[in-house]
């Protein structure tokens, strides 16, 4: 008996990973989703999933989403002071460090809204050196809710790295945000 499951699992070449993640993030924002926090568990600030979200900062800011990131490896010297575009479009962002080394056995994770979830490869594997396993769940409330619950538990056990950055003072013109104006 075969089971049909809505997840799309794939093995992806390391060079294509960031592009595929950026397309997944763009799909989420193209569907005019609710402005829930974007939750991210990543190996480091240099992880392709972090870069994909950083590239989407104009969209994140335009809809008023907050970004909460848990890193398995944190170099305080390399952390950004804030996420902004041209210094003029700040994003509500918090970073935490999961000091427990066992976290490296976990998988990277991105949760957007109530039904978009990406699960990446194990954080012990360097994404720059090998191909990766990943799954994409679009429109799957159960998967996203389960991932959100896991994130919140890990968040509570993690140490703050940076203070929370305040959200923008007023509405953001997405065209101006994209131009960096």
Put a short name on every predicted segment.
Residues 2-39, 43-181:
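PLD/PLD-like phosphodiesterase catalytic module centered on the HKD motif
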């Amino acid at each position: 008996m075969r089971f049909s499951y809505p997840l799309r699992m794939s093995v992806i070449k390391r060079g294509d990973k960031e592009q595929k993640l950026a397309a997944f993030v763009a799909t989420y924002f193209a569907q005019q989703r609710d402005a829930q926090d974007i939750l991210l568990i990543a190996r480091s600030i240099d992880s392709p999933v972090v870069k994909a979200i950083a590239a989407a900062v104009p969209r994140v800011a335009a809809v008023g989403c907050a970004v909460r990131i848990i890193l398995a490896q944190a170099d305080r010297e390399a952390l950004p002071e804030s996420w902004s575009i041209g210094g003029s479009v700040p994003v509500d962002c918090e970073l935490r460090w999961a000091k427990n080394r066992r976290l490296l056995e976990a998988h990277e994770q991105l949760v957007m809204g109530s039904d978009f979830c990406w699960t990446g490869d194990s954080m012990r594997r360097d994404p720059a050196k090998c191909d990766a396993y990943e799954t994409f769940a679009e429109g799957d409330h159960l998967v996203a809710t389960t991932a959100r619950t896991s994130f919140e538990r890990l968040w509570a056990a993690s140490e703050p790295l940076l203070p929370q950055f305040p959200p923008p003072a007023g509405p953001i013109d997405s065209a101006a945000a994209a131009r960096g104006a």
